[in-house]
Amino acid sequence: MQAKTTSEEYVIPNFAQTINNRTIVNIFESCKYRSPLIICALNDAVLAKEYSNSMAMGSGTITFMIDNDVDIMSSLYTTFRTVSTLLLMGNQLCVFIVVPMSVISTDALTAIAYAYRGAMIELRHYGRGDDYVQERLESLFKLSPLCGTPHMGPKYYGPTVFSELLDLSHHNKTSWYSVIDYSMFTRTALVGFASYMMKTLSLNSSIVNIVGYNPPYVWAAMMHGVTIRYIEKEIPNPKGKGPMGLIMPELNGRVLTNKVKYVLHNPQIKLLCLDSMMFMSSRNIVYIGAYPATHLLDMNLRGWNIYAVDPEITQQWISDMKAKTGANICASSRKFMFDVSENIKINEFFGNQPYSIIDDSWVPDNYEQFQDKKRNYFQELVKSDQKVTLITMKWNTRKNVTCEKLLALLPQPYGGKLYEMRAFFHRNGIGSITIDANSVEKYIQKFQELPLGAQVGTQKFMHTMISRVQDVMSIQPKKGDVIIASYSLSNASNPKKKVLEYLTKASKSEAMIIFGAPNLERVKYMRERGVLPGNNITINGEKITFNNPSGKKWTDFGYTNSELLACDMIEVTIEQMVSFMSTSFRGTGYYSNSIYNDLFSWFIPIWVWNQTMQIQDIRLSPVALVKCFTTKIRNLCYVPHSTYYALRGHLVAKMFSENNIENNCYSISGKSNETFTVLKDFKFPTSIGVLEFKAGEKVNISGHLLSLAVAAHFVAVPVTMWARHIKYMTVDRQKPPDVDRILFFDNKIKRNTLEKWHTKSEVILAALIAGEYVGLMLNNFHSKAIVDDLCNTVLATFR
């Protein structure tokens, strides 16, 4: 087939020469490492140039440098348009930014890095010649092509314990760990996004409801200043004593054998799990034995009130804790008396609002007597009319003890070899119970014999105290409710029709709900191509069954974009969420992605999009998707740049011919900035109306749409959002006053006017040829269902 471009003719290569099923599988595999970008901002251009050369020569890193001597917007555009073509090529990419913060803020640069799934290194707080900058760049050079900074997030809690790593490698689980790694990122991103939107939309809620249990949500909530509640259909019986079975629950029961595996928190911080759960129980915390509480310094505790007591407390400690956590703190360096006099001060500080107590106090002498005094005080407190939500205290006693209102007696997930448990008192605790010292000793010994993963898994017992046992779909969603239903509602135990009805109700009631599910057509395509995502997958109709290497098996319903759109839900990728938050995201990043995670898509209500995301800047742009897949295929097939664009012109001409449009009405240009020129007026009928073309008009069909149709076979593509954005930009628009101008570097912007992208006709024509275009690009190894779903969504948007 041929297409005339200028005075020469270019033969369109036969994609069958190189594109076969193995090629498709290789593209899937390359998606695992499609985050090779690092943005490094510093003040020293000489040093940046030196390490740019060293990394390029030493590891094949493709480097770029932007300094303050160039037009910043233009330089950002050319640099990152280049980056977008290279994201699947396998080379590390590093962009050195030597521009003052007054020109490009850390927030803007972080948003750009995350938009391209990159890592952000900010060194502009250090002056030229600072030793730390030299050390950091030397580390970057030595680690290349790896990166010592996680992608898409500032934190990382991977398998840091040697025994854990050894266990993974012995059981052939290391490849599956990238799935867990990325899942941890996903869960913390969802909590961060919910928190960000709660503030942005001024929602009258401080609670995020989590459908489906997984431990990292608690830590993520602490990092983003929100409170969570789990909503579970059922919770396995812990088989201990007490009303919830949490007084010394079984250590070999279904709770632990079915434990959720996840990336560990820092195992050196034994109080992190306990304190995180207690901070979820109340926004008012009495912390007895608070000093030093270093594990809290990294948390976002704005909105929490802490009444801290410890003889070691200093004014400096109070200042640091307030400054770093944002909490409102009342601190006392005297001993806590464990008597009624304390209650008056506590109630005054909390304004007579409910509160929880964390006790981590200890004395060197008469410790048994000290424990008796605390225990008696706490059990009387929960029996009184005081507004006490929950109390936890150390349990080190080595004698038989009878107590009241005990709700739970649990091991400490990171307790190590300590002879110590945690008691929890609550108004609904058991009336009276005698705890046998010998039984406690045997229980602790059994706990210490468990592998680390199982020990950490016991925090599930604690989390049942912040869980609600109910089918979320039986709860009427209300305006302002915040719900995360990812990896949960899509489970096959939830009828698909019922889930779609619930999502419709939630969206229409203006609840802020985030829904995640496998994309049915993408899963089917992956299976047809024989791709192995690290676990076995079988498909039966709309049901998808997963088997992971550890033997866990689960079945989900697959969903499509069209189904969710009918529920007033719009797709947003996790990367868009994180880029939109920028530096407000304080969760975990990752080092490699997984094919398994790319099977999922996430959706938010359209009303949220309408209020916050109606105009596209780099944070919401699909720019990291539109170039890299087609560029990789073009390089595999040695397709010249001019030939690639000639193909588009050829397909448009073919379509016009099939629809009886005379060829003297237009002239095919087949260039990157012009598909054809209109020679005389003509009309072209389509399923959504008649397109009119005027003589002299230069038409450039949407390449973004065509590229997205290819990318949608491999990764989540937010086509509905993109279609709405491009429809909005069929005319010039004013830049939103509250959005940094830098974030529009990928737009054409003059003063504060954003120039239009494409006409309606240019988008519709691209949608109409997309099926044949993708078929040629992938040599008919494509999914008609994926392309049809994408194009029908675009056409419906412009209808």
Curated annotation (Swiss-Prot):
Name the chemical reaction catalysed here.
Answer: a 5'-end diphospho-ribonucleoside in mRNA + GTP + H(+) = a 5'-end (5'-triphosphoguanosine)-ribonucleoside in mRNA + diphosphate
Q: Does the keyword GTP-binding apply?
A: yes
Which EC number(s) does the record attach to this protein?
A: 2.7.7.50
The record's principal subcellular location, in a coarse class, is virion
Query: Which CDD domains does this entry report, sorted A to Z?
Result: capping_2-OMTase_Phytoreovirus (cd20759)
Q: Which UniProt keywords apply?
A: GTP-binding, Host cytoplasm, mRNA capping, mRNA processing, Nucleotide-binding, Nucleotidyltransferase, RNA-binding, Transferase, Virion
Q: What are the GO BP annotations of this UniProt entry?
A: 7-methylguanosine mRNA capping
Q: Which GO terms describe its cellular component?
A: host cell cytoplasm; virion component
Q: In which pathway does it act?
A: mRNA processing; mRNA capping
GO terms of molecular function: GTP binding; mRNA guanylyltransferase activity; RNA binding
Q: Which locations, inside or outside the cell, does it occupy?
A: Virion; Host cytoplasm
Physiological role? Enzyme involved in mRNA capping (Potential). Binds to GTP and might have guanylyltransferase activity. Together with the RNA-directed RNA polymerase P1 and protein P7, forms an transcriptional complex positioned near the channels situated at each of the five-fold vertices of the core.
Describe the family membership recorded for this protein in Swiss-Prot or TrEMBL.
Belongs to the phytoreovirus protein P5 family.
Q: What is this protein called?
A: Putative mRNA-capping enzyme P5
Q: Which organism encodes this protein?
A: Rice gall dwarf virus (RGDV)
